[in-house]
UniProtKB/Swiss-Prot annotation:
Xref: HAMAP family: Ribosomal_uL2_B (MF_01320_B)
Gene name, Swiss-Prot/TrEMBL: rpl2
Subcellular location(s) of the protein: Plastid, Chloroplast
Organism for this UniProt entry: Rhodomonas salina
Protein name according to UniProt: Large ribosomal subunit protein uL2c
Chief location of this protein within or outside the cell: plastid
Amino acid sequence: MGIRIYRSYTPGTRNRSSSDFSEITKSKPEKSLLAKKTQKAGRNHRGVITVRHRGGGHKQRYRIVDFKRNKRDIEAKVASIQYDPNRNARIALLHYKDGEKRYILAPKNLSVGAQVSAGETAPLDVGNALPLSNIPLGTSVHNIELLPGKGGQIIRAAGTSAQIVAKEGNFVTLKLPSSEVRMVYKQCYATIGEVGNAEFKNLTLGKAGRKRWLGIRPTVRGVVMNPCDHPHGGGEGRSPIGRARPVTPWGAPALGMKTRRKNKYSDFCIIRRRK
């Protein structure tokens, strides 16, 4: 992936950059792997806002991505690398020998025409999925299962990868991008390599309208609201929040307060917390 930097010929292109999409080999998605995606605008089934700052955005169709990699010991050919509006990573279209087609996350350096497979005996090549117990120490992996057979749940964002650092008993120890070190069951599957499109983090939107295209609405500071709208609101002119520490719109501690639930079932898996 390359980054296209725009000249400042309008205010909207000043400091603007975007992907050059040089790695995209096919523009039209596979129709059999599309699903309807309804815009929720942050509302739940009762119409109550449960996620703020969501709404609008370009109409999208969901691409059904295979996170489980449960088609074992059957080789597939990479037919194309495609854009997915629902995530920052690219997706790869696979054509299996038995005729089935599936999408997977496109790892770095995966090219059209490459052969990929999943299973305990799959070779240690980029894009192949194996149990963590069969992957050597020091290998970079992504799309990692937390429970065997549930499908990949972590390390799916563009440019991310985890490293296998130890194996002991029924667990494999991973170092995550957040510097957290945690254990995962050795039967869990993971995909070899790093997720592609690593330059995504260096993009600059350049104008508010591009945020709106993504379905993200403005975030208003609580200190500029009225007292009835936020605990930080009110006062004459530019006044402070009037509290010892910042809080959320509902009065809960914010900015630095740990939000992980105490005594969570997976606490025993975490060796070192993220920084």
